[in-house]
Amino acid sequence: MGQFITLMQSIPEALNMAFNVALVIVSLLCVTKGLINLWKCGIIQLLMFLALAGRSCDGEYKIDRRHVLSHVEFNLTRMFDNLPQSCSINNTHHYYKGPENTTWGVELTLTNTSVMNRSDENVTSIRSLGFGNITNCDKTGEAGHTLKWLLNELHFTVLHVTRHIGALCRTTAGAGLLIQYNLTTSDKGGEVGRHLIASLAQIIGDNKAAWVGKCYNNCTSSGKCSLTNCEGGTHYKFLVIQNTTWPNHCSYSPMSTVRMIIQKTAYSSVSRKLLGFFTWDISDSSGQHVPGGYCLEQWAIVWAGIKCFDNSVMAKCNKDHNEEFCDTMRLFDFNQNAIKTLQLNVENSLNLMKKSINGLISDSLVIRNSLKQLAKIPYCNYTKFWYVNDTITGKHSLPQCWLVSNGSYLNETHFKNEWLWESQKLYNDMLLKEYEERQGNTPLALADLCFWSLVFFTTTVFFQLIGIPTHRHLIGEGCPKPHRLTSNSLCSCGFYKIPKKPFRWVRKGK
């Protein structure tokens, strides 16, 4: 009886506490709902749009309130610092720089004027370049390895030719390296000069194909002319190879060297599958490995700092093997392990790198990108990759290759559908993971029902609101996000260039 009386006496106190809690909850809900309504009505977005209309659109591309488009750009210079690197000033002057921090290089020049005269200096004909035997020609002592490697690739790897009647070299001691090919001379095995220039085009890249292709201009009596009998040749008569200093002739890149190494792989008709998996791990500032992902060190990327990707991204690489980003990651991983375990000289390092690239890079991807490059379709150069970054959780999507067209990277607007799709996939993966974690810890009970009921009620209230328009939308065009159109229908980023196009005001999300 006494316990019952005590219980009845405590009811008012309990009710008073419950009412206080209810008032706090209602107050929080009202404030929260008021802020949400203020944001959802569109007045803040309208003021921001009017303040920023016509400004530059070069900032980061925000997909939504938590996803932004980011990218990582690789620095391949250190990875391939034991390989010669090349660049081109124009269609006639090309350079190969020696490995690492050397100050010398090899210059390749296409010209119509011969630089050799048998009567003025010591000149010998090169009858055989078997095994890179250029001892009599190379008087520099330091460029020998690079020169032998270059000639071997030109003659054996690409051409399978060991002789060239029109090749001359200077043998004067102390005069430096000088080799001249007569591109108009052919031996009994075929038009070696024509094949030589075609192989040089493959090495330098498709963008230098302007001087590959010779046509005859046939004109009729009526004055009409047409190009006929086009061949894979050049109108230049001589290819001159000589040693030179390296005062930064042009911005060199190892990609031409990599293209030379993998060019046979690009034309392979048999596809390989990787036989093993790589162990991805994360390294802290002291170099200790911590499980949980993979970090690119400072030397591997263009800007300073360390960029890490979690295990979910790396797991996709180990599962599918069908992305250029995964190929590049395997090259970095191989390079890192090779540095730790191997002490090789330059030639052995080069041979090992050639075998590793042929064994690691997926044939199907190389073939696909090579065909795209030949067809003038945007292709991947294995250097720059974009990904979607969740600014709240720090999660990333699997990086995709940033395609190249006409020697420059595509603008973000050209692949907007791709990064929007990656954002949606990242959302789905995160929601699925959160749902599985919640189901594993607690079942969907009363708290979940209350939460989803509140979300449903709030959503139905929002549907009844009439919002304020937030931005200009060109009639008949896609949504201009994130372009800030002026009253003349223009944007300073240059994507919308036609003025006075009809537009209408729309609300965000419509």
Swiss-Prot record:
GO terms for biological process: fusion of virus membrane with host endosome membrane; receptor-mediated endocytosis of virus by host cell; virion attachment to host cell. One of its GO terms (molecular function) is metal ion binding. Residues 2-17, 54-58, 59-448 are extracellular. Zn(2+) 2 binds at H471, H473, C479. Disulfide bonds join C87-C250, C295-C308, C317-C326, C380-C401. The record marks D58, G59, L275, G276 as: Cleavage. Pfam families: Arena_glycoprot. Residues 33, 470-510 are cytoplasmic. Keywords: Disulfide bond, Fusion of virus membrane with host endosomal membrane, Fusion of virus membrane with host membrane, Glycoprotein, Host cell membrane, Host endoplasmic reticulum, Host Golgi apparatus, Host membrane, Host-virus interaction, Lipoprotein, Membrane, Metal-binding, Myristate, Transmembrane, Transmembrane helix, Viral attachment to host cell, Viral envelope protein, Viral penetration into host cytoplasm, Virion, Virus endocytosis by host, Virus entry into host cell, Zinc. Zn(2+) 1 binds at C57, H483, C491, C493. The record marks K33 as: Important for GP-C-mediated membrane fusion. The chain crosses the membrane at residues 18-32, 34-53, 449-469. Glycans are attached at N75, N90, N101, N112, N117, N122, N133, N182, N218, N243, N381, N389, N406, N411. GO terms for cellular component: host cell endoplasmic reticulum membrane; host cell Golgi membrane; host cell plasma membrane; membrane; viral envelope; virion membrane. A lipid is attached at G2 (N-myristoyl glycine). Stable signal peptide (SSP): cleaved and functions as a signal peptide. In addition, it is also retained as the third component of the GP complex. The SSP is required for efficient glycoprotein expression, post-translational maturation cleavage of GP1 and GP2, glycoprotein transport to the cell surface plasma membrane, formation of infectious virus particles, and acid pH-dependent glycoprotein-mediated cell fusion. HAMAP family: ARENA_GPC (MF_04084). Belongs to the arenaviridae GPC protein family. The cytoplasmic domain of GP2 plays a role in ER location. It also contains a zinc-binding domain that allows SSP retention in the GPC complex by accepting a cysteine from SSP as the fourth ligand. This is Pre-glycoprotein polyprotein GP complex. It comes from Pirital mammarenavirus (isolate Rat/Venezuela/VAV-488/1995) (PIRV).
